[in-house]
């Protein structure tokens, strides 16, 4: 490490003067600098310029942008948000439930949903992907805002880049999957069941002669029951027979799901992408309003393909260019049995970083905005102490741990309710 010295206009890097042992929690470095008080503003200015260089990455198709993201992802591999414990750090949270990707906390009338970097498929966690939680959360926020003309949603606020605070509601135990293409590699994917000879799936009659990745004649609904272990395909008639929803609820949610998907297809195609399939979850608020919950049109809940190369690759029998987690699924299927093997191989680091890039590429492409990469260097500084009469200032230079940042932001948000 090094210390900063010089006048406000001529800051220089000097060898470190003092290094104290940091706590593992904050990973802080105490350094003595020769800065005078008047130099603080210069340090602040320098940090802002450095930060903007790192995070202001605009959407670009050139290799330089992809390289920047891959480098940033590689540097964050050991700092992913794989687990949270806000029930231990935020006052007022009543309990925690751990999903495959999200940690959900009960806050009375609201739920605090923390989107982690955990990557799930085949009903289990496969890896942790840098920036993934932030990408999913911010992608959903964008779509929640854009789809309010179709359906209300449970969003209340987003106090942190990984956090959504939502209205508490009774979630229907059904996931509404909408598809336009026959594809996939999981047990419940349309291509898997079709290849096994099934021609009536979730109440949909499928014609003979379809091939993988082919476009269907219309959008179709293929619901599944929600389960902690394994989702089970179910038809609309079975949903009613099992008492999972009333007919009115089923009709309303089905119409909303199809309308959301149609709108998502339109937005995706306008930006050079194909929304292949996706899943939605809905709940009922205390006043009876049916609302969209969880996430919407993220690369975790959806498949996206590059539009301009789809037809040529399909005609050649080549897998479409995808902008989702399908290529990671395929890697695991080629190297193990992800459903039955007790221990899975570790995903290659270059594959993990590539997935981080694809998720960010999707966010930037859909939203036409830049993705703010978290600063992986010194995030902020604090005045530690000033020895009287010494003319020196000691600074605490620190990268704020992700969990501390989330704790701070969630605590502030809940205190305002």
Where are these regions (language model features)?
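Short Pro/Gly-enriched beta-strand edge/turn motifs at strand-loop
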Residues: 10, 17-18, 80-91, 259-264
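Catalytic activation segment of kinase domains across protein kinase-like and atypical kinase folds
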Residues: 281-326
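N-terminal mitochondrial targeting presequences
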Residues: 2-6, 38, 46-76
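A long amphipathic alpha-helix within ATP-dependent nucleotide-binding catalytic cores
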Residues: 245-276
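Active-site loop/lid in soluble adenylation, ligation, and acyl-transfer enzymes
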Residues: 64-227, 338-417
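Beta-rich nucleic-acid/ligand-interaction surfaces
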Residues: 161-162, 274-292, 381-383
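Short glycine/proline-rich, acidic loop/turn segments that cap or connect secondary-structure elements
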Residues: 7-10, 319-339
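N-terminal chloroplast transit peptides
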Residues: 1-45
């Amino acid at each position: 490490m090094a210390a900063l010295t010089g006048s406000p206009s001529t800051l220089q890097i000097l060898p470190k003067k003092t290094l104290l042992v940091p706590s593992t929690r904050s990973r802080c470095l105490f350094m003595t600098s020769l800065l005078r008080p008047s130099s603080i503003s210069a340090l602040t200015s320098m940090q802002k310029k450095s930060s903007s260089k790192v995070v202001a990455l605009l959407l670009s198709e050139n290799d330089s942008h992809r390289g920047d993201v891959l480098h940033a992802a590689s540097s964050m591999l050991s700092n992913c948000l794989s687990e949270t414990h806000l029930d231990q750090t935020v006052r007022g949270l009543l309990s925690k439930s751990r999903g495959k990707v999200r940690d959900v906390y009960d806050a009375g009338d609201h739920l605090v949903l923390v989107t982690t970097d955990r990557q799930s498929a085949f009903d289990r966690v496969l890896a942790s992907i840098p920036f993934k939680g932030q990408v999913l959360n911010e992608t959903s926020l964008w779509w929640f805002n854009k789809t309010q003309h179709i359906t209300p949603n449970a969003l209340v606020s987003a106090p942190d880049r990984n956090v959504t605070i939502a209205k508490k509601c009774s979630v229907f135990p059904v996931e509404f999957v909408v598809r336009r293409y026959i594809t996939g590699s999981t047990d419940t994917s349309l291509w898997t069941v079709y290849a096994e000879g099934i021609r009536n799936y979730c109440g949909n009659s499928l014609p003979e002669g379809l091939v993988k990745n082919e476009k269907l004649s219309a959008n179709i609904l293929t619901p599944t029951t929600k389960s902690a272990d394994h989702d089970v395909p179910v038809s609309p008639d079975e949903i009613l027979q099992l008492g999972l929803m009333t007919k009115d609820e089923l009709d309303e949610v089905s119409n909303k799901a199809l309308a959301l998907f149609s709108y998502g297809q339109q937005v995706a195609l306008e930006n050079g992408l194909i929304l292949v399939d996706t899943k939605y979850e809905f709940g009922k608020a205390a006043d009876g309003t049916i609302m969209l919950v969880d996430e919407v049109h993220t690369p975790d809940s959806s498949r996206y393909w590059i539009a301009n190369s789809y037809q040529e690759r399909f005609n050649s029998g080549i897998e479409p260019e995808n902008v989702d987690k399908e290529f990671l699924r395929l890697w695991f299927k080629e190297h193990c049995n992800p459903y039955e093997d007790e221990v899975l191989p570790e995903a290659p680091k270059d594959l993990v970083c590539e997935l981080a890039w694809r998720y960010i590429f999707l966010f930037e492409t859909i939203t036409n905005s830049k993705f703010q990469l978290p600063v992986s260097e010194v995030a902020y500084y604090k005045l530690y102490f000033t020895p009287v009469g010494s003319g020196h200032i000691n600074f605490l230079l620190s990268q704020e741990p992700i969990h501390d940042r989330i704790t701070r932001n969630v605590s502030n948000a809940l205190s305002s309710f």
